[in-house]
From Swiss-Prot:
Binding site for Zn(2+) 1: H13, H15, K99, D247
GO molecular function: dihydroorotase activity; zinc ion binding
Family, as annotated: Belongs to the metallo-dependent hydrolases superfamily. DHOase family. Class II DHOase subfamily.
Residues the record lists as N6-carboxylysine modifications: K99
Domain of life: Bacteria
Keywords, in A-Z order: Hydrolase, Metal-binding, Pyrimidine biosynthesis, Zinc
This protein's name: Dihydroorotase
Source organism per UniProt: Alkalilimnicola ehrlichii (strain ATCC BAA-1101 / DSM 17681 / MLHE-1)
Catalytic activity, as annotated: (S)-dihydroorotate + H2O = N-carbamoyl-L-aspartate + H(+)
Length: 343
């Protein structure tokens, strides 16, 4: 197969940042994807509907000419988010989810939730109003090994949460383990999961063997090869609760290549071609449209996009870096190739 045409896809987990970074990365997504769930972990975080509205306007103002892209905004959950803010979010028409960052779990998560018990009334309001909770699924206790954080989160936080709030819709974002796949398969229909390019294409050996490769460093961290294989099987299975979420996360090159580098992989420059490569290798190109264009919209209760995009099988070079303000942005598979391109 040399060409495939899909319903225009959506990205259900995206970091756009702000300012010069926003201006650099937004065109990569907006020219291919119809919509994206926009992460709220700015500095300061987007914790109110008014802040989300202002951020949305900055995104719309930065769109390239001719782009028809809708940013789906989120709120950053804190220990003190009031139920009234959830009511306002649900009525806004542009806030589509609330994001749970356990405090200290990833980039700009210091203001995150320290104890989910403090959020029970807020979570109940979300369940009542049908506003999904997107979760970064890791515990952050010092005694838990970084490679085990996700499994602990399932047992200690996610499953009890799902059982306590029987109507709450939950998106288990950027899953990385066989344990997460197994959990999703037996979870209620109101629990979905996103899968990233890097977790489907790479394991921890890519990051650590033969030298540390900081541009593979992300959170949740890359896992074992058997976990990667389980993720590929899940993504390509056609299961309706696994869907595309890149977690594309830009950082300046200098912030990645340092003694204490930032977590995040930038994949938006070729996200859909990367997923096509993954699905082709699995013999499942016929299921790419469901994963990329249908499942996420269906889970969020939004209409599927009405237009389409076409991919062509053609080896396409990837730049070593993109200019970004006074620094540069190193993309996933920098200096290499991807087997598909959007035409």
């Amino acid at each position: 197969m040399q060409r495939i045409t899909l319903t225009r896809p959506d990205d259900w987990h995206l970091h756009l940042r702000d300012g010069e970074q926003l201006a650099t990365v937004l065109p990569h997504t907006a020219t291919v994807f119809g919509r994206a769930i926009i992460m709220p972990n700015l500095k300061p975080p987007v914790t109110t509907v008014d802040q989300a509205a202002a951020y949305r306007e900055r995104i719309l103002a930065a769109l390239p000419a001719g782009a028809h892209f809708e940013p789906l905004m989120t709120l950053y959950l804190t220990d003190n988010t009031p139920p009234a803010e959830i009511e306002k979010a649900a009525a806004s028409g542009f806030v589509h989810a609330v994001k749970l960052y356990p405090a200290g779990a990833t980039t700009n998560s210091d203001a995150g939730v320290t104890d989910l018990a403090r959020c029970e009334e807020t979570l109940a309001a979300m369940a009542e109003r049908g506003l999904p909770l997107c979760v970064h699924g890791e515990v952050t206790r010092d005694e838990v090994d970084i490679f085990d954080r996700e499994a602990h989160f399932i047992d200690e936080v996610l499953d009890p949460l799902v059982q306590r709030h029987s109507r709450l819709r939950v998106v288990f974002e950027h899953i990385t383990t066989q344990a997460a796949v197994d959990y999703l398969r037996q979870a209620p229909d109101r629990v979905g999961a996103t899968l990233t390019v890097q977790h489907l294409m790479a394991n921890r050996n890519h990051m650590l063997v033969g030298g540390v490769r900081p541009h593979y460093y992300c959170l949740p961290i890359l896992k074992r090869e058997r976990d990667r294989q389980a993720l590929v099987e899940a993504a390509t299975s056609g299961h309706p609760r696994f869907f595309l979420g890149t977690d594309s996360a830009p950082h300046p090159k200098g912030a990645k290549e340092s003694a204490c580098g930032c977590a995040g992989v930038y994949s938006a420059h070729a996200a859909l071609p990367f997923y096509a490569e993954i699905f082709e290798a699995a013999g499942a190109l016929d299921r790419l449209e469901g994963f990329a264009s249908h499942h996420g919209a269906d889970f969020y209760g939004l209409p599927r996009n009405r237009d389409s995009v076409t991919l062509e099988r053609a080896a396409t070079p990837i730049p070593e870096a993109f200019p970004m303000g006074d620094d540069t942005l190193v993309p996933f598979r920098a200096g290499g190739e991807v087997a598909w391109r959007v035409v």
